[in-house]
């Protein structure tokens, strides 16, 4: 798979910055990761090197532009070969998507561990949904 197109057609530094910012933030979408896994991008060494290159977004001078900080967590998870393989499953993509949703609701994202231990715990969806319903009733 040829991935040189990722950087080869970028005309200037401003455009490159915008393209790379958009790309790194797309990593916060589990369904996009599912697409990449199903289309074997994570088997391409050049693409994996590009993901490693994206680590510069953690630097203070760049992180301030990140709107979806979950993307940096996903970038960490993508270092784990098991996670890269597992995210191709629709059930896992849905689980990760649900956990992100509950994080946005203020319920807290399940802890995945380090890049070496990127296992996913089952979200407490039914319990969380009941809590959300009770909260709505009390408002």
Swiss-Prot record:
Pfam family name, one: Med31
Example of a GO biological process term: regulation of transcription by RNA polymerase II
Keyword terms: Activator, Nucleus, Transcription, Transcription regulation
Oligomer status and interactors: Component of the Mediator complex.
Similarity comment text for this entry: Belongs to the Mediator complex subunit 31 family.
The protein's role, per its UniProt record: Component of the Mediator complex, a coactivator involved in the regulated transcription of nearly all RNA polymerase II-dependent genes. Mediator functions as a bridge to convey information from gene-specific regulatory proteins to the basal RNA polymerase II transcription machinery. Mediator is recruited to promoters by direct interactions with regulatory proteins and serves as a scaffold for the assembly of a functional preinitiation complex with RNA polymerase II and the general transcription factors.
Protein name: Mediator of RNA polymerase II transcription subunit 31
Species this protein is from: Schizosaccharomyces pombe (strain 972 / ATCC 24843)
């Amino acid at each position: 798979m040829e991935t040189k197109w990722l950087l080869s057609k970028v005309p200037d530094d401003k455009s490159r910055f915008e393209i790379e910012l958009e790309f790194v933030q797309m990593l916060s979408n589990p369904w996009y990761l599912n697409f990449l896994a199903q289309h074997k991008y994570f088997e391409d060494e050049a693409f994996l090197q590009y993901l490693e290159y994206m680590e510069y977004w953690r630097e203070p001078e760049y992180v301030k532009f990140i709107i979806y900080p979950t993307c940096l967590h996903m970038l960490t998870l993508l270092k784990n070969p098991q996670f890269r393989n597992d995210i191709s499953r629709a059930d896992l993509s849905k689980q990760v998507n649900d956990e992100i949703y509950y994080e946005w609701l203020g319920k807290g994202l399940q802890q995945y561990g380090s890049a070496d231990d990127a296992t996913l715990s089952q979200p407490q969806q039914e319990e969380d949904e009941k809590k959300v319903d009770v909260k709505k009733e009390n408002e």
